[in-house]
Amino acid sequence: MISSVPYRERQSIGGIRSCPHSPASSRFPRVNDSAPTVFQGWDVPIGTPISMNIWNTHYNKDFFPGPTEFWPERWMGEGTRELEKYLVPFGSGSRMCTGQNLSIAEQVLTIATLFRNYELELYQTTKKNVVMASYCMISLPGSESPGIQVKVRKTVQ
């Protein structure tokens, strides 16, 4: 999927990795019902629900070196297929969201249309204003941040 898409799609993919729609979301838990299991030194008894968290997966340094950096180029070249296994904002496996490709296409078209029709300039915005600091059910900037402020001018066509 990702290995054959243009740079703008890689930017979109980088964005949904670094700032997922719902970082607290996780896969539907599976229940360990076959045998007691040991995971990283922890005993996991039979009947224990097991799941994963999007945020912890997307910010795991073992999967994504420099996880806090927005780096669309990580989705280019060799190793891309391996990274795709850890990109889970749409879930994974048989229960993966069927709208994944549509969502990415909509993001790319929206951004392209926005930049084609408008000139955008950051206004009184620093990196501190956009670093995600609060995570519960949605991605949010820090409580002191006014968010991203932008001056918008219509482009003459």
Curated annotation (Swiss-Prot):
Its cofactor is heme. It comes from the Eukaryota. This is Cytochrome P450 monooxygenase atG. Pathway: Secondary metabolite biosynthesis. It is an enzyme of class 1 (oxidoreductase). GO terms for molecular function: heme binding; iron ion binding; monooxygenase activity; oxidoreductase activity, acting on paired donors, with incorporation or reduction of molecular oxygen. PANTHER family: CYTOCHROME P450 (PTHR24305), CYTOCHROME P450 12A4, MITOCHONDRIAL-RELATED (PTHR24305:SF166). Its EC number is 1.-.-.-. Cytochrome P450 monooxygenase; part of the gene cluster that mediates the biosynthesis of terreic acid, a quinone epoxide inhibitor of Bruton's tyrosine kinase (BTK). The first step of the pathway is the synthesis of 6-methylsalicylic acid (6-MSA) by the 6-methylsalicylic acid synthase atX. In the biosynthesis of 6-MSA, atX utilizes one acetyl-CoA and three malonyl-CoAs as its substrates and catalyzes a series of programmed reactions including Claisen condensation, reduction, aldol cyclization, and the hydrolytic cleavage that yields 6-MSA. Heme binds at C97. Belongs to the cytochrome P450 family. Disruption phenotype: Abolishes the production of terreic acid. Coiled coil: none annotated. Keywords: Heme, Iron, Metal-binding, Monooxygenase, Oxidoreductase. Terreic acid is a metabolite with antibiotic properties. Terreic acid also acts as a selective inhibitor of human Bruton's tyrosine kinase in mast cells and other immune cells.
